[in-house]
């Protein structure tokens, strides 16, 4: 089974092709997430259906937007991390060819070793010390506003006096304390068996961890008389460092900020690893997260979402509603002037009131989407028929409805078998049987579109 046959489901969920760019995947996710966000739906059944769809879309985006996860998915076609079935035993022809491409090419390291040893040897023979991971606990406001943090750290550095050997320097003469590595017998690499599928095992050469691939290492002094006076025979010293971490506005939780070359130094390593600061979440963010209906983890985008409920009269005549308190302590109030009609299904888009765009030189933000729920009155809400008449008189009539009322009345004037339907059930458009589309007269659609073009609502 080819990779394209077994690994297209997540691409289909987002409606993109396998060769889609990161931006195309992000754009597709934002459109679908806005369309299927469960808070847009009042009906409980519709809410539950779209909640499932929303979670499926988000899960697909989390994998396809991550290069490492996407690569794994493209290869194995399984978003749960395990290889999907291919061939008779879960190991297909493509996997078999990849195995031989990885382990039986490029010759060997010195002409006498296992084929493919050179690649494995080079990959394992790292010249850099290990990275250090540090968690930073932040609030949503910290991420929105940005924050500068200082850390007092102690890091290990190689002793200058003994150059990391741990031995007391000898005057006038140079003494070496290198010995052959017994772990790899001086070869610098060791043979290891690696499993690539059911019944498929190969021998692979990897760098020796004890000597770091050199075949030898420096023997540490045991007698305190031979200890370096500065590092007491350890070869390393502890050094205090003040590290400044700038959390720029617009970061998300799970983002990683890297400070290059400031990890611990290690003996026999030519370069230092990095400090990696992982942005984690403080628990007091729950209320704000519920207000903005957003996943604030990494890759979540810059748009924010919230919702309001208005009455039918407010939808027709305008309204002024408090929205929320922003992360920079502003109070946002939405004002829709009389004359602008908000229709069922409309979503109000407020530009530049979303999440900050990371490293944007102009300080731009994403957008704030406001899902509008229109609360209709219950049946038989009126007290007098005169109230209904007043509404009919003041509201504009539909020309399309009038045209339907007069169609073919002259030809049908002699018919006596007329019937008025009063027993019916009103259902939501989302609950229509599959394949049935709601009818929209062209004149009504045109008028609707013209009215909507004058203000910033999207559907």
From Swiss-Prot:
**Key words of the record:** Chaperone, Membrane, Metal-binding, Mitochondrion, Mitochondrion outer membrane, Repeat, Zinc, Zinc-finger
Show me the CXXCXGXG motif repeat boundaries: 159-166, 181-188, 208-215, 228-235
The signal peptide stretch is none
What's the superkingdom here?
Eukaryota
User: Which PROSITE patterns is this protein grouped with?
Assistant: DNAJ_1, DNAJ_2, ZF_CR
In what residue span(s) does the J domain sit? Answer: 7-79
GO: which molecular function terms?
ATPase activator activity; Hsp70 protein binding; protein-folding chaperone binding; unfolded protein binding; zinc ion binding
Give an example GO biological process.
Answer: protein refolding
Keyword Mitochondrion among UniProt keywords: yes
Zn finger intervals (CR-type)? 146-240
| Gene3D superfamilies (UniProt xref) | DnaJ domain, Heat shock protein DnaJ, cysteine-rich domain, Urease metallochaperone UreE, N-terminal domain
One GO cellular component, as annotated: nucleus
Q: Where in the cell is it found?
A: Mitochondrion outer membrane
The misc remark on file is: Present with 1210 molecules/cell in log phase SD medium.
Protein's name according to its UniProt entry: DnaJ protein homolog XDJ1
Organism of this sequence: Saccharomyces cerevisiae (strain ATCC 204508 / S288c) (Baker's yeast)
